[in-house]
């Protein structure tokens, strides 16, 4: 992951609920699309993590872990806002997300009129389950027409499910894609009873 530096919370070893972690590259105008980079705000490096009512924001690779080794990590998120634009929840860990806001990061000057296609997830083989979550935008640049996908593969056997989620018109009709040719055929991608107001 690029543009990685410590937040104040990490410097003082703070963990808990009701945190706000916003990954910003020092000296960069992060509302400008040209500064979009991979930058973890929350990196999974432990088992049995529980996160409640936290705001976890960045652009790409906001929440997750890089690498292909499956260490059997498990995480639970409830009532959180998790934001980004590209694969902003990604990597090899199993997770359940209940009642979370999945927030598209918007940019003031991207080349597609602030409607840059993004991907919420890029899972490996461990499943991500989203229940009663809502897809939103950050609203930073007005009410723009963001249209993205639930996710894309990150290798064979990617696994993600969205159950009874509200997409607010921010997910395109295809819903899913792949990072490399042929991976989608072995992916386990599910949608159940989602709404699109």
Please report, for each region that a protein language model flagged, where it lies by residue.
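Sequence-level preference for short, compositionally simple segments enriched
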Residues: 1-197
